[in-house]
Amino acid sequence: MTEYEYRVGDTDAGLAPAGIDQPRIEKAVREILLAIGEDPDRDGLVETPARVARAFAEQFAGLSQRPEDVLTTVFEANHEEMVLVKDIELYSTCEHHLVPFYGAAHVGYIPNTDGRITGLSKLARLVDIYARRPQVQERLTSQVADALMERLEPRGVIVVVEAEHLCMTMRGVRKPGAKTVTSAVRGAFRESYKTRAEAMDLILGRR
């Protein structure tokens, strides 16, 4: 197995993606428990450092994956109209507080004149690669769009992400239910209002 062949679930078999130092994470979590006044050796917490290390290995698996590893399958389908995958569930981790944000991504593109497309599941995998790392939603949205532009060379790309951030829900301003919406448009979607509006109508279910 190479460092880029890690898949979600491998941690259950004791494997971890390249760059994840699980023993170091365990030591750090133990120190955090001590720092907040807890006893890391009591029942209920004694296995917590190891559990957190395994969870982090899964949550941050995208750090050792590259978009070219999933956008490898390209078909010559002679399809030149929009391709859109809606409601791709995503879970990520806010890099400011290391708490989750979650929601959905909508990813669309217009193939180039050669009609090259990729598998629909590849779009979901691409979202996962960038979601499974310390992130901010704005960068996540742009990274997905830029990766598609680079790998597929389509006429245009649109990515819209809607997410709820627990750093706003469970702490700070404490506004549960508030959602953040970000978008990234490239090529034809940036240049043509009509094309962009068509995509947004499809995303919002108006067509």
From Swiss-Prot:
Residues binding Zn(2+), per UniProt: C94, H97, C167
GO molecular function: GTP binding; GTP cyclohydrolase I activity; zinc ion binding
Any one GO biological process: tetrahydrofolate biosynthetic process
Domain of life of the organism encoding this protein: Bacteria
Disulphide bonds in the chain: none
PROSITE patterns registered for this protein in UniProt: GTP_CYCLOHYDROL_1_1 (PS00859), GTP_CYCLOHYDROL_1_2 (PS00860)
One Gene Ontology CC term in the entry: cytoplasm
Stretches of the chain forming a coiled coil according to its record: none
EC number: 3.5.4.16
CDD domains xrefs: GTP_cyclohydro1
Gene3D superfamilies: 1.10.286.10, 3.30.1130.10
Alphabetical UniProt keywords: GTP-binding, Hydrolase, Metal-binding, Nucleotide-binding, One-carbon metabolism, Zinc
Protein's pathway: Cofactor biosynthesis; 7,8-dihydroneopterin triphosphate biosynthesis; 7,8-dihydroneopterin triphosphate from GTP: step 1/1
Enzyme class: hydrolase
Catalytic activities: GTP + H2O = 7,8-dihydroneopterin 3'-triphosphate + formate + H(+)
Record has Zinc as a keyword: yes
Family, as annotated: Belongs to the GTP cyclohydrolase I family.
Subunit structure: Toroid-shaped homodecamer, composed of two pentamers of five dimers.
Record protein name field: GTP cyclohydrolase 1
Gene name of the record: folE
